[in-house]
């Protein structure tokens, strides 16, 4: 059953700081320890060809990763899921080297357990991910995954390649923790929210184009005082949203970026502090 979007009450804007919107200053993520595994997986419509390595199991509809490492994917997969389940103390890198993955029952990429996962978009390659309109959950009480790319833990998207996310069920790219984007040409079309980080969304680079039936970017952690923020320090972002462009519970900061929005709700809705540099946020004219 599809997840219905929630319409939040009007928020109070407490602080608006206007500063200069100067040159680019992308923040680079820290290094990731990925273990010894370095495997290639090639999709061929209904077939999956993969290196025979420990920690990687393959079936017709699932590629399951159980050990940290670097995993490179290419080709077209008509119906399947990349499942990462390596444990909360480990990290992995998923390299999308020209993939087109559809899942007719769930999410194409589901990070079930990991400390952190990086999704790297290979230079110049086109990648397309499309999820189901209705999900079949392993645990109906859990209702996870709930995004076309979904992670229970931290996720970073980087690189210079292209990524198109067609989210027919709920959110486009979602995580229960922190979502970071440092690069890539990313297009998201979402039935609900475009980018959803429960704890935070941080963008330091890339060209991002979001079309969402609800909010463009959404963060909603109210339980931890140091969480619940959106921080944009670089990149070019276009947001078309039927609700709000950016919705965050604690703070929204936009500097050294070009953000253009076309919305049915607010450009920015925030229950806390706003720090938006002059000239960094404007209307999208098309």
From Swiss-Prot:
Binding, Ca(2+) 2: 154, 178
Subcellular location: Cell membrane
N-palmitoyl cysteine lipid attachment residues: 21
Major place of residence: membrane
Alphabetized UniProt keyword annotations: Calcium, Cell membrane, Lipoprotein, Membrane, Metal-binding, Palmitate, Signal
Chain residues that bind Ca(2+) 1: 152-153, 177
Region (Polygalacturonic acid-binding): 124-225
Residues spanning the membrane: none
Membrane among keywords: yes
Residues anchoring lipid (S-diacylglycerol cysteine): 21
Cellular component terms (Gene Ontology): plasma membrane
Superkingdom of the organism of origin: Bacteria
Keyword Repeat: no
Protein known as: Carbohydrate-binding domain-containing protein Cthe_2159
Organism name: Acetivibrio thermocellus (strain ATCC 27405 / DSM 1237 / JCM 9322 / NBRC 103400 / NCIMB 10682 / NRRL B-4536 / VPI 7372) (Clostridium thermocellum)
């Amino acid at each position: 059953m599809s997840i219905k979007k929630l319409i939040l009450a009007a928020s109070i804007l407490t602080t608006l700081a206007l500063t200069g919107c100067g040159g680019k200053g992308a923040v680079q993520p820290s290094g990731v320890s990925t273990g010894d595994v370095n495997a290639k997986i090639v999709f061929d419509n209904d077939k999956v060809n993969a290196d025979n390595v420990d920690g990687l199991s393959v079936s017709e509809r699932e590629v399951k990763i159980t050990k940290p490492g670097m995993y490179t994917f290419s080709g077209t997969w008509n119906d399947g899921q990349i499942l990462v389940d390596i444990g909360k103390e480990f990290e992995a890198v998923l390299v999308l080297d020209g993939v087109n993955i559809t899942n007719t029952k769930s999410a194409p990429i589901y990070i079930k357990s990991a400390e952190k996962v990086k999704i790297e978009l290979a230079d110049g390659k086109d990648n397309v991910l499309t999820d189901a309109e209705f999900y079949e959950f392993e645990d109906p009480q859990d209702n996870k995954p709930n995004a076309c790319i979904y992670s229970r833990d931290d996720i970073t998207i980087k690189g210079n390649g292209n990524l198109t996310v067609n989210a027919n069920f709920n959110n486009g790219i979602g995580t229960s923790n922190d979502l970071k984007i440092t690069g890539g040409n990313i297009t998201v079309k979402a039935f609900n929210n475009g980018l959803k980080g429960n704890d935070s969304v941080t963008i330091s680079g890339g060209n991002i184009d979001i079309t969402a039936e609800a909010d463009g970017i959404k963060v909603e952690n109210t339980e931890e005082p140091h969480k619940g923020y959106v921080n944009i320090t670089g990149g070019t972002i276009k947001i078309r949203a039927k609700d709000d462009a950016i919705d965050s519970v604690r703070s929204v900061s936009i500097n050294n970026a070009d953000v253009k929005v076309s919305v049915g709700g607010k450009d920015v809705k925030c229950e806390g502090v706003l720090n938006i540099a002059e000239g960094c946020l404007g209307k999208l004219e098309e």
